Amino acid sequence: MMTAEVTAADAEVLLAQPRGFCAGVDRAIDIVERALELHGAPIYVRHEIVHNRYVVEDLRGKGAVFIDELDQAPAGAIVVFSAHGVSQAVRGEAEARGLRVFDATCPLVTKVHIEVARMRAAGREIVMIGHKGHPEVEGTLGQAQGGMYLVETVEDVAALQVSDPGNLAYVTQTTLSVDDAAAVAGALKARFPGIVEPKKSDICYATQNRQDAVKLLAPECDLVLVVGSTNSSNSNRLREVAERKGVAAYLIDGAHAIDPAWLQGRRSIGITAGASAPEVLVQQVVERVRELGAVSVRTMPGLEESVAFPLPKGLSRKIAQTESLE
């Protein structure tokens, strides 16, 4: 049992709104759970379905097997692609090995993949703004055979060498800092004035909304706790947004990770959660902060999200067929 040491005596807890799960994460988790219900364990999932330890362990307990590469799944197995998306090479490998695929790629990531295909078909080279090594970035870069460049910072733009400066377009990772992405996009436009931008921002609605919510939350607090795993891009960006507002901020996987010393003397403690972090973890954090002395909890004003994405058609058909037999 956790210590009941009091370090946040009489503090107020402020909850960001919105926070936590987005529509793409809800859909991805639902796909794995529905696949398990229809076909039973094991269901193989390429990479973590979403970047959250609690979610992954919960699904593992239900029979999901998380793999790094497709060759770890037996031929003919059922495989779910994670919400981050995959390259065309991975899709080809799955088909060649006779794997039965349920695609949990977030529809907003798929939108970027379609943009890449359209831009390359028009003969343009593409600059992607994103974090090297992130699964979403690897999947998006893998939509084209060459002709793509990756930049992360304004300095990367200054050093960028392209084959055809007059025939460029750019896309972005969906979970970037809105402000950082705007700065890098601005640098691209300044260096390559004719560069074609996406028709609509590639940064997803949930990333934008959660960052905006932290910008409202942080000035009201002297500490912000961000619930999310360390490998979650959007959760890390929330911590950075709070810090840029001059507030101490910590990224935590859950209540167990709270150091009581962080709360010493704090009068107002903000709590938010990345788009892959479930609300149950937020409530556990709230309860832990109450144990440490907080006396009230208030939700900040903010957007009420109503976005929902449908399940893949193939999975929806199977569910409908099963239900019709019951």
Swiss-Prot record:
Binding annotation for (2E)-4-hydroxy-3-methylbut-2-enyl diphosphate: H51, H84, H134, T174, S232, S233, N234, S276
Residues where [4Fe-4S] cluster binds: C22, C106, C204
Sequence positions that bind dimethylallyl diphosphate: H51, H84, H134, S232, S233, N234, S276
Catalytic activity field: isopentenyl diphosphate + 2 oxidized [2Fe-2S]-[ferredoxin] + H2O = (2E)-4-hydroxy-3-methylbut-2-enyl diphosphate + 2 reduced [2Fe-2S]-[ferredoxin] + 2 H(+); dimethylallyl diphosphate + 2 oxidized [2Fe-2S]-[ferredoxin] + H2O = (2E)-4-hydroxy-3-methylbut-2-enyl diphosphate + 2 reduced [2Fe-2S]-[ferredoxin] + 2 H(+)
Textual note on the cofactor: Binds 1 [4Fe-4S] cluster per subunit.
EC nos: 1.17.7.4
Cofactor: [4Fe-4S] cluster
Keywords, comma-separated and alphabetical: 4Fe-4S, Iron, Iron-sulfur, Isoprene biosynthesis, Metal-binding, Oxidoreductase
Pfam families: LYTB
Residues at the catalytic site: E136 (proton donor)
Pathway membership, UniProt: Isoprenoid biosynthesis; dimethylallyl diphosphate biosynthesis; dimethylallyl diphosphate from (2E)-4-hydroxy-3-methylbutenyl diphosphate: step 1/1; Isoprenoid biosynthesis; isopentenyl diphosphate biosynthesis via DXP pathway; isopentenyl diphosphate from 1-deoxy-D-xylulose 5-phosphate: step 6/6
UniProt: isopentenyl diphosphate binding residues: H51, H84, H134, S232, S233, N234, S276
GO biological processes: dimethylallyl diphosphate biosynthetic process; isopentenyl diphosphate biosynthetic process, methylerythritol 4-phosphate pathway; terpenoid biosynthetic process
Top-rank taxon: Bacteria
Gene Ontology MF term list: 4 iron, 4 sulfur cluster binding; 4-hydroxy-3-methylbut-2-enyl diphosphate reductase activity; metal ion binding
Keyword Glycoprotein carried by entry: no
Membership in a protein family: Belongs to the IspH family.
Primary role: Catalyzes the conversion of 1-hydroxy-2-methyl-2-(E)-butenyl 4-diphosphate (HMBPP) into a mixture of isopentenyl diphosphate (IPP) and dimethylallyl diphosphate (DMAPP). Acts in the terminal step of the DOXP/MEP pathway for isoprenoid precursor biosynthesis.
Record NCBIfam families: ispH_lytB, PRK01045.1-2, PRK01045.1-4
Protein name in UniProt: 4-hydroxy-3-methylbut-2-enyl diphosphate reductase
Organism of this sequence: Bordetella parapertussis (strain 12822 / ATCC BAA-587 / NCTC 13253)
